[in-house]
Amino acid sequence: MDIVVLGGGVVGVTSAWYLAKAGHKVTLLERRDGVALETSHANAGQISPGYAAPWAAPGIPLKAAKWLLQKHAPFTVRPTSDPFQLRWMLKMFANCTPAAYATNKGRMVRLAEYSRDCMKTLRDELALDYEGRQLGTLQLFRSQAQLDASKRDIEVLEEYGVPYQSLDASGCEGVEPALARVRGKIVGGLRLPGDETGDCFRFTKALAAEAQKLGVEFVFNCAIDEIELSLGRAVAVRAGEQRFKADAIVCALGSYATGFLRPLGIDLPVYPVKGYSLTLPMTDADAVPRSTVLDETYKVAITRFNERIRVGGMAELSGFNLALNPKRYDTLAMVVGDLFPEGGDISRAEFWTGLRPMTPDGTPLVGPSPVPGLWLNTGHGTLGWTMAAGSGQLLSDLISGSSTAISDEGLTLARYG
């Protein structure tokens, strides 16, 4: 089939690679002059299936209210004039019940665990250079209350068979020796050895090069105008004077998919959740994490690359505003300076922001749309890279009419009625 993929982030490029591998003729359209230049560009650098869980969880509405009053809050809301923001938040809070959380968590873990398997197969097949490490994630607890609360997370991990290690402060230093330099700040941790790290930008560029070898055509600086319908079916994409005919179209436009598809009568429950990161040159290899650590208090991840440190996190509901908020810089700088004060040169930090495409229930949208011939692969939230390989393989199988390795139940737009 002739297939057009819209969007050159990690989800779009991964979709294109799997579709080309299945034998399809694939064209990828991207408005920027290269791949992974927006949300996939400078994320936290984690592939974390062990942390595949919806933000919509019991107790979150109360926590969110408290966070709004904190100086270094992990979550903030900047009200906009768009009524969709409020509707999306109400849908999210409606998913904060124990029953909804359990259902959504199960769907996300199913896809994330499958994606980890797909990622391993992909990594074994292709010699991709993306500064990847397979050394796990260490979640750090600064208080006994956080450590005690992790027992609920451990129960969920055991339920889904996710390997873990519950560690005291000494155990955390054994996994991440640099933490010994700030002894007394951490009371314990939860390690997920199956998680991975790396530079998502480098990964996406490397995979795009492999996709080109399979015949994928990349069209950059391409401003997509609309999807053309014939007898109710998606048959082409128009971009200026260009027309790209297609047997199938994959929308992997992240947060921008919602507005783009609205003229077709498709109501996507995907809203941008703004995240921030700092990238620092490493100054002392013994004073930084070996892999990635997640500060539970501030919801900030610190990830080691070859010669750099990536500090990422935060969640800001402010629409499509891409302005860099200096308060977020202060929080990220505070966390990395507090835990790894001698590891990087903060004076040379690169400050970045991106818009994560989030659904109210946390589960992405992977599968058919209400318009025949148009397929969705968006809404992955903070787990875009974590779920990219599994989502790409699943979508390729669905489009190809092949049997799928996992069920797509609850992963499509159909769950929203």
Curated annotation (Swiss-Prot):
It catalyses: a D-alpha-amino acid + A + H2O = a 2-oxocarboxylate + AH2 + NH4(+). One of its GO terms (biological process) is D-alanine catabolic process. Pathway: Amino-acid degradation; D-alanine degradation; NH(3) and pyruvate from D-alanine: step 1/1. Pfam families: DAO. FAD binds at residues 3-17. GO terms for molecular function: D-amino-acid dehydrogenase activity. Its cofactor is FAD. The keyword Ribonucleoprotein does not apply. InterPro entries: DadA (IPR023080), FAD-dep_OxRdtase (IPR006076), FAD/NAD-bd_sf (IPR036188). GO terms for cellular component: cytoplasm; plasma membrane. Keywords: FAD, Flavoprotein, Oxidoreductase. Belongs to the DadA oxidoreductase family. Oxidative deamination of D-amino acids. This is D-amino acid dehydrogenase. It comes from Aeromonas salmonicida (strain A449).
